Curated annotation (Swiss-Prot):
Record GO biological process: mitochondrial electron transport, ubiquinol to cytochrome c
Gene Ontology molecular function: any one: ubiquinol-cytochrome-c reductase activity
Note describing how the cofactor binds: Binds 2 heme b groups non-covalently.
Organism (species): Vanderwaltozyma polyspora (strain ATCC 22028 / DSM 70294 / BCRC 21397 / CBS 2163 / NBRC 10782 / NRRL Y-8283 / UCD 57-17)
Pfam families associated with the record: Cytochrom_B_C, Cytochrome_B
Alphabetical keyword list: Electron transport, Heme, Iron, Membrane, Metal-binding, Mitochondrion, Mitochondrion inner membrane, Respiratory chain, Transmembrane, Transmembrane helix, Transport, Ubiquinone
UniProt cofactor(s): heme b
GO CC list: mitochondrial inner membrane; respiratory chain complex III
Lipid bilayer topology: Multi-pass membrane protein
Name of the protein in question: Cytochrome b
């Protein structure tokens, strides 16, 4: 008698879903910090779906952009809900993403054999920041206009060709109609690129499987994804939806900027030009360097420095679960990152400039100096502890 394989395993398409979402073996010890991946997937779906519906009513003409957003809010049925879901969805996307990155830093998810997973994740992070900036400009409020002006002007720091690049980006001599139209075109396109890179991220993860809080091989104790971790993910999905709904329905503008409810005016400069809260730490790093070119290089380096962790972390044990020194400096790093975000909101004046420069130094020191030094010290301590036994 021949045994018949279940349809979910025999079907060429369902077998992929089965291998990733149902029978995928996961370490039994993974905790709720591993739920951020599913929440990020939910955020991406929310952003793409709401974005498609917003694009049906949005006009990228600079004369109509701001008015079309107000039209969505006032005249389109449930337009206010779609717009607030999209705006707050971006903030929740970054909340989950920063938590996901912090989990990776704490538990050593960047170490071999998951270097590819980490690298692709950093690419997703960069693309998400680009999509967020482009979308913020599409509203064409006062902060959108000046944010677009300031950030695109950064390219003028490139020697010889910088000014030509800025004019090419603008499509004119200032942020104008061609700028907003091309920004909207790319803002619509980038999320689908992110979705494709997310699939690559999952493929790379599927090769070696998830890491675990203990930092040891999880091949000896794994359980299927469905029935255990799917239900566990649903718990955080419900908690996420409750918190998300509280912001969307009761406090939709808390995470935004009030100046963006004023139409963009190139003749009036705001008292303080700041991006959305999730870009503030990197904006603070940019402003902490007096030289324009060095500031731009430092800001981009602050993102790309995540890629050096697989090289600089020399620890023989993955993750910080059993490392006192690494835990201490990790939480110093988290506090410093939050401080950079607060500094990014302030005016460029004493003492915020000095604090920003010190925080920037600590930020880079963590990746380039602290992690390799602490990892080598802890390696010696582990060796001494093993020999003494």
């Amino acid at each position: 008698m021949t045994m018949k394989m279940s349809y979910r395993k025999s079907n060429i398409y369902l077998s992929l879903v089965n291998s990733y979402m149902i029978d995928s073996p996961q370490p039994s010890s993974i905790n709720y910090w591993w739920n951020m991946g599913s929440l990020l997937g939910l955020c991406l779906v929310i952003q793409i779906c709401t974005g498609i519906f917003l694009a049906m009513h949005y006009s990228s003409n600079i004369e109509l952009a701001f008015s079309s957003v107000e039209h969505i809010m006032r005249d389109v049925q449930y337009g206010w809900l779609i717009r607030y879901m999209h705006a707050n969805g971006a903030s929740f996307f970054f909340m989950c993403m920063y938590t996901h990155i912090a989990k990776g830093l704490y538990y050593g998810s960047y170490k071999s054999p998951r270097v590819t997973v980490w690298t692709v994740g950093v690419i997703i992070f960069v693309l998400t920041m680009a999509a967020a900036f482009l979308g913020y400009c599409c509203v064409y409020g006062q902060m959108s206009h000046w944010g677009a002006t300031v950030i695109t002007n950064l390219f003028s720091a490139i020697p010889f060709i910088g000014k030509d690049i800025v004019l090419w980006l603008w499509g004119g001599f200032s942020v104008s109609n061609p700028t907003i139209q091309r920004f909207f075109a790319f803002h619509y396109l980038v999320p689908f690129i992110i979705a494709a890179v997310v699939i690559m991220h999952m493929m790379a993860l599927h090769t070696h499987g998830s890491s675990n809080p203990l930092g040891i091989t999880g091949n000896l104790d794994r359980i299927p994804m469905h029935g255990y971790f799917v239900f566990k993910d649903l718990i955080t999905v419900f908690v996420f939806m409750i918190l998300f709904s509280l912001f969307v329905f009761y406090s939709p503008n808390t995470l935004g900027h009030p100046d963006n409810y004023i139409p963009g005016n190139p003749l009036v400069t705001p008292a303080s030009i700041v991006p959305e809260w999730y870009l503030l730490p990197f904006y603070a790093i940019l402003r902490s360097i007096p030289d324009k070119l060095l500031g731009v290089i430092t800001m981009f380096a602050a993102i790309l420095v995540l890629l050096v962790l697989p090289i600089t972390d020399r620890s023989v044990v993955r993750g910080n679960s059993f490392k006192v020194l690494s835990k201490f400096f990790f939480f110093i790093f988290v506090f410093n990152f939050v401080l950079l975000g607060i500094i990014g909101m302030q005016h460029v004046e004493v003492p915020f400039v000095l604090i920003g420069q010190i925080s920037t130094g600590i930020y880079f020191a963590y990746f380039i100096i602290i992690v390799p030094v602490i990892s080598m010290i802890e390696n010696v301590l582990f060796y001494i502890g093993r020999v003494s036994k």
